């Protein structure tokens, strides 16, 4: 009888709001494991790539981003474990690159898989870094939309812009060195595309009896 009461009480406790083990949804649990595992993959990949960096500028970018991602990983892991606001706020990533993109295509050698470790250079390292950051940015975006815990949702969504910034920093490095070239359309096509949209005019028409206004505060 006592065992039955304990089981019944345990089942009742599972439905009580505010219980630490019950403020995460099922999808959220799986997605958070993907997010945190993905972050570890980025950090591990950066650590493995570091030994091959030849350009000090790229090495500085790698180290700066690794340090930032580590700090945000700790915040995310803490928030997920406690289900509450983390002890530290999410940070803003400040890149060092200027925002000047070089447009146009220049002749370059076709890309192909490396045949030995000696073929690894800064262009390959920066490409691997960019792919890792882009993939994690996508994961954060998709996962944040599945979060039921408001603290975890805010922590994830706050990091998306920072990953965009880190990806842009790596792109600018690649672009400056000719590793990532940016083609452009001719002037006429660009002008036509820029003028393909016009501002929206007016507001939605009211529904009969003003029912569309009910419940809006």
Swiss-Prot record:
Main localisation: other
Domain of life: Bacteria
Subcellular location field: Spore coat
Claim: Transmembrane is one of the keywords in the record: no
Positions in coiled-coil regions: none
PANTHER family reported in the protein's UniProt record: SPORE COAT PROTEIN F-LIKE PROTEIN YHCQ (PTHR39183:SF1)
Region (Disordered): 1-28
Gene designation: yhcQ
Naturally occurring in which organism (per UniProt): Bacillus subtilis (strain 168)
Gene Ontology process terms (BP): sporulation resulting in formation of a cellular spore
InterPro entries, alphabetized: Ferritin-like, Spore_coat_CotF-like
Family: Belongs to the CotF family.
Protein name listed in UniProt: Spore coat protein F-like protein YhcQ
Low complexity bias locations: 1-11
Keywords noted in UniProt: Sporulation
């Amino acid at each position: 009888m006592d065992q039955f009461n304990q089981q019944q009480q345990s089942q009742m406790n599972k439905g009580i709001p505010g219980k630490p083990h019950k403020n995460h949804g099922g999808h959220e649990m799986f997605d958070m494991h993907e997010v945190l595992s993905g972050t570890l993959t980025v950090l591990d990949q950066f650590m493995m790539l570091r030994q091959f960096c030849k350009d000090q500028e790229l090495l500085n970018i790698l180290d700066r981003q690794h340090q930032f991602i580590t700090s945000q990983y700790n915040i995310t892991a803490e928030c997920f474990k406690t289900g509450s606001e983390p002890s530290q706020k999410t940070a803003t990533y400040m890149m060092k690159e200027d925002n000047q993109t070089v447009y146009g295509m220049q002749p370059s050698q076709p890309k192909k898989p490396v045949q030995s470790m000696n073929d690894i250079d800064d262009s390959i390292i920066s490409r691997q870094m960019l792919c890792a950051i882009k993939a994690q940015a996508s994961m954060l975006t998709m996962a944040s939309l599945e979060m039921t815990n408001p603290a975890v949702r805010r922590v994830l969504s706050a990091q998306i812009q920072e990953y965009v910034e880190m990806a842009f920093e790596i792109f600018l490095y690649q672009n400056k060195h000719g590793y990532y070239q940016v083609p452009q359309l001719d002037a006429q096509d660009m002008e036509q595309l820029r003028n393909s949209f016009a501002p929206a005019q007016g507001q939605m028409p009211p529904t009969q009896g003003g029912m569309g206004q009910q419940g809006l505060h």
